[in-house]
């Protein structure tokens, strides 16, 4: 059966059609930008844990034939008792011309950096050692920032042209561990769906960790110190890490919050195609890229 167009809030849908529009052109977007897919869907299942991920080019970028600047990450790192899932999103800063490259590389570089410290990282999360987790998170993001600067040099461009946020959830695959690590740098959101209710301020801070007040969002590679948090979960919880294309309407639009609370309830995890359709719930004036990685916490074994 056909799902049809994504549902929308309000009496009328947004003006733009909810389908891919003009592709980015090589002369204007570069070869990397021209090859960024309009839509990405991913997922994984490990024991009682189920993951769905998707990233969709926003209406504004589709209309202007610009590449999607968001990226998503679903990576399995470590080995043995130190195996972890790294679930993340990166949102390329709109004013940075190569932010689509920056967001892709930030996800890949972060997974690699965390893999190199997977043993102590898994131990810090399992032991609820926030200072230890924070130190490892800062080490990893500092490495990502350095490598992004090297990429800028290789391109002959300024590091700020690769500016991107980064938001990662670190999930031990040990079923006995119910603690998750959260690493955030820049805007976006982390939400918890528990017993049908959303907590959309999970891990939120007033001004990030910057000492200087700045109206711009902190972003790699200029900012390299993340905010680190540990989250205790329960069986049946649903955790969402997302870019602000979703976090803003999820926190500010009741129709979006109600729709996704039903769609992503723990009773039935959606398949990848259904998840993509649900993620695209439309609200007028929200036309940015939209990306999310969602973790369903299965029952205790």
Language model segments and positions:
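C-terminal catalytic subdomain
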Residues: 1-25, 210-301
């Amino acid at each position: 059966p056909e799902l049809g167009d994504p549902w929308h809030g309000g009496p009328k849908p947004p003006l733009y059609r909810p389908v891919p529009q003009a592709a980015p052109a090589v002369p204007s977007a570069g070869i990397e930008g021209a090859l960024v897919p309009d839509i990405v869907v991913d997922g994984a299942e490990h024991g009682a844990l189920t993951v769905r991920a998707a990233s969709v080019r926003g209406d504004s970028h589709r209309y202007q034939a610009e590449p999607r600047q968001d990226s998503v990450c679903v990576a399995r790192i470590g080995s043995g008792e130190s195996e972890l899932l790294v679930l993340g999103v990166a949102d390329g800063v709109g004013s940075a011309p190569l932010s689509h490259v920056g967001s892709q590389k930030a996800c890949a570089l972060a997974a690699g950096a965390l893999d190199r410290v997977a043993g102590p990282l898994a131990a810090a999360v399992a032991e609820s050692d926030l200072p230890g987790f924070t130190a490892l998170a800062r080490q990893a993001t500092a490495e990502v920032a350095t490598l992004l600067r090297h990429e800028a040099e290789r391109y002959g461009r300024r590091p700020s042209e690769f500016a991107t946020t980064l938001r990662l959830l670190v999930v031990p695959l040990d079923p006995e561990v119910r603690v998750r690590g959260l690493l955030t740098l820049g805007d976006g959101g982390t939400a918890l769906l528990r017993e049908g209710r959303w907590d959309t301020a999970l891990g939120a801070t007033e001004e990030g960790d910057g000492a200087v007040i700045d109206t711009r969002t902190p972003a790699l590679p200029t900012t390299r110190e993340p905010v680190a948090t540990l989250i205790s979960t329960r069986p049946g919880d649903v955790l969402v890490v997302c870019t602000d294309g979703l976090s803003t309407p999820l926190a500010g639009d009741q129709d979006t919050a109600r729709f996704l609370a039903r769609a992503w309830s723990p009773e039935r995890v959606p398949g990848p195609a259904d998840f993509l359709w649900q993620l695209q719930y439309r609200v007028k004036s929200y036309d940015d890229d939209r990306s999310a990685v969602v973790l369903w916490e299965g029952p205790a074994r």
